[in-house]
């Protein structure tokens, strides 16, 4: 996730609407949009230590366990 997708508060370029293809999800917090953008990326860095299933976001792993 790069500054171009999320923006920067210090430059008044804070864009809280997802710009990925036709997705237009909007949030009020920067960390929420950063977390949302992860659903568009194929990485799954959060792995269950019990069954080995992997998830894109930590909250998805937490729901699984």
Swiss-Prot record:
Keyword annotations from UniProtKB, A to Z: Activator, DNA-binding, Metal-binding, Nucleus, Repeat, Repressor, Transcription, Transcription regulation, Zinc, Zinc-finger
GO molecular function, one term: DNA binding
Pfam families: zf-C2H2
PROSITE patterns recorded: ZINC_FINGER_C2H2_2
Zinc finger (C2H2-type): 16-40, 46-65
Upregulating conditions: By alkaline conditions.
One GO term of the biological process aspect: positive regulation of transcription by RNA polymerase II
Subcellular location: Nucleus
Annotated S-S bridges: none
SMART domains listed in its UniProt record: ZnF_C2H2
Major location (coarse): nucleus
Gene3D superfamilies: Classic Zinc Finger
GO cellular component entries: nucleus
Family: Belongs to the pacC/RIM101 family.
Role noted for this protein: Transcription factor that mediates regulation of both acid- and alkaline-expressed genes in response to ambient pH. At alkaline ambient pH, activates transcription of alkaline-expressed genes (including pac1 itself) and represses transcription of acid-expressed genes.
The name this protein goes by in its record: pH-response transcription factor pacC/RIM101
Organism, as annotated: Colletotrichum gloeosporioides (Anthracnose fungus)
